[in-house]
Design a protein with these regions (language model features):
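Low-complexity, intrinsically disordered Gly/Pro/Thr-rich segments
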Residues: 152-156, 162-170
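Short, conserved secondary-structure transition motifs
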Residues: 170-177
C-alpha cells in the first residue's frame, strides 16, 4: 500500500501533508479523473462497505451506540457466513465491519491482558482513542463491559487510559439483533 502511494506522490497524482502524514488529491483535474473512475467502476459494494466502515468507526468515537449496532447489523447481512451461531462468527463480522480502522489502529485479536484475553484491542497509530472491544453471543452488551472491567483488560494500555473506549457488542440469536454499549474508561 505504501509503495503505491509513494509512487502516486512522485508521479504528481497525490500530494503529501507531512504535518498529519496524509495523502490528498492535489488538483481539480486529478479529482475529476478520480471521481469518473469510481463512477464508471463496478466497486459499488466495496465502496459502500468502506464508507460504512468509516462511518462505524466515527460512530464508535462519538459513542453513538445505536448507530454502531446498525452498522454491525449491516456488516452481518453483507458477510457470507453460513452459520452465524457463535462468538467466532460475530468476531469475523466485527473484523470486517471495522476494516477502515486499520488506517488508524493496530488491531490485536485475543490480546492477553489483565486476567484473560480481550477479544479485540485497537491501539492507535495517531491521536485517536484506544479501544477495547468485547463481544458477547446471546448475552447483554452490558455483560461485555462488565467483563472488560472485572478482568482488567485495560492492563497494558496504561498510556491510553485518558482516551480509552470500552465497547461491548452483543448479538441476540432469538431476536437476531445486535446491541452496543460504549463507555469511556474511568
Amino acid at each position: 500500500k505504501d509503495d503505491v502511494l509513494t509512487l502516486l506522490i512522485h508521479l504528481g497524482y497525490l500530494g503529501y501533508n507531512s504535518s498529519n502524514q496524509t495523502c490528498y488529491i492535489p488538483n481539480k483535474e486529478v479529482i475529476d479523473s478520480f471521481v469518473n473512475s469510481i463512477r464508471s467502476s463496478n466497486w459499488n459494494e466495496t465502496t459502500k462497505a468502506l464508507l460504512n466502515s468509516r462511518a462505524l468507526l466515527e460512530a464508535t468515537w462519538n459513542r453513538d451506540e445505536e448507530l454502531v449496532a446498525k452498522y454491525i447489523e449491516e456488516a452481518h447481512l453483507d458477510t457470507a457466513i453460513l452459520t452465524y451461531n457463535n462468538e467466532n462468527a460475530l468476531s469475523y463480522t466485527i473484523s470486517i465491519a471495522y476494516i477502515y480502522a486499520r488506517n488508524h489502529y493496530t488491531i490485536i485479536r485475543e490480546m492477553p491482558s489483565g486476567k484473560g484475553y480481550a477479544d479485540m484491542v485497537f491501539i492507535p497509530k495517531d491521536d485517536k482513542p484506544a479501544m477495547i472491544v468485547e463481544l458477547k453471543w446471546d448475552h447483554e452488551a452490558e455483560t461485555a463491559i462488565d467483563q472488560i472491567k472485572e478482568k482488567k483488560y485495560y492492563c497494558g494500555l496504561e498510556k491510553y487510559l485518558d482516551e480509552l473506549l470500552l465497547v461491548g457488542i452483543s448479538y441476540n440469536k432469538e431476536t437476531k439483533e445486535h446491541s452496543c454499549i460504549i463507555e469511556r474508561y474511568r
